[in-house]
Amino acid sequence: MALSLTNKNVVFVAGLGGIGLDTTKELLKRDLKNLVILDRIDNPVVIAELKTINPKVTVTFIPYDVTVPITETKKLLKTIFDKLKTVDILINGAGILDDHQIERTIAVNYTGLVNTTTAILDFWDKRKGGPGGIICNIGSVTGFNAIYQVPVYSGTKAAVVNFTSSLAKLAPITGVTAYTVNPGITRTTLVHKFNSWLDVEPQVAEKLLAHPTQSSQACGENFVKAIELNQNGAIWKLDRGTLEAIQWSKHWDSGI
């Protein structure tokens, strides 16, 4: 069911960098009620700029590192819910691309996303009297087919796709819907220089950028279109300036 973002309260994890920042700018054109940006690094200049895009929207920045214990995330979310009373959408966008940092890549790209999602279920889960909500998780096309020189990063993104697809199937129980947006190669600082696993390909960034890419602005525009389409369980591919729903092939079924 299509979703109007007018007067919605949105929490955006990692909404200040790369794809996140251009998506934030696009969201602000939609007359949200509140946009709460949770990010590890404060950038007052950018926050001030964002506040001028649409004075109707209240933009709030709160420092947040997705690798903190889940108890800390729950405390932070409680302060947000106490202030706003309700949150309509959670966007999980934290991510790093550096296969030298194996544990941190998993912690930021996957564990942090799972913990933030699990924490907000305390407030949304209809079994606890919650109103439900919408989760938008940022994956990557590498979650479909890996960039094999960065298997750790690619593996975390495959995990995000599977985790989110499971959340979508649990919506009748929890009242919380979910989908992934999966950008292709996008011209951001993330891909300009990064390390391959065990240095198997020292020129991996240069070789990747030799292929067709997209701007973060084009990606952000399609990102918001996907949010407005609001399809539970969707696996969106945002590549080369296009938006496409992926039909996932089923090769096995648990039968439960």
From Swiss-Prot:
Residues binding NAD(+), per UniProt = 12-41
* UniProt keyword annotation of NAD present: yes
InterPro entries assigned to the protein according to its UniProt record, in alphabetical order: ADH_Drosophila-type, NAD(P)-bd_dom_sf, Sc_DH/Rdtase_CS, SDR_fam
Query: What are this entry's molecular-function GO terms?
Result: alcohol dehydrogenase (NAD+) activity; aldehyde dehydrogenase (NAD+) activity; protein homodimerization activity
The catalysed reaction is: a primary alcohol + NAD(+) = an aldehyde + NADH + H(+); a secondary alcohol + NAD(+) = a ketone + NADH + H(+)
Checking Gene3D superfamilies in the record gives: NAD(P)-binding Rossmann-like Domain
EC number(s) reported in the record: 1.1.1.1
Q: Can you supply a Gene Ontology BP term from the record?
A: NADH metabolic process
Residue positions of the active site: 153
Report the domain of life of the source organism.
Answer: Eukaryota
Q: Which residues bind substrate?
A: 140
Keyword tags: NAD, Oxidoreductase
> Listed GO cellular component terms?
cytosol
Q: Which SUPFAM superfamilies match?
A: NAD(P)-binding Rossmann-fold domains
Q: What is the top EC class of this enzyme, as a single word?
A: oxidoreductase
Quaternary structure annotation from Swiss-Prot or TrEMBL: Homodimer.
Family, per entry:
Belongs to the short-chain dehydrogenases/reductases (SDR) family.
Name of the molecule in the record:
Alcohol dehydrogenase
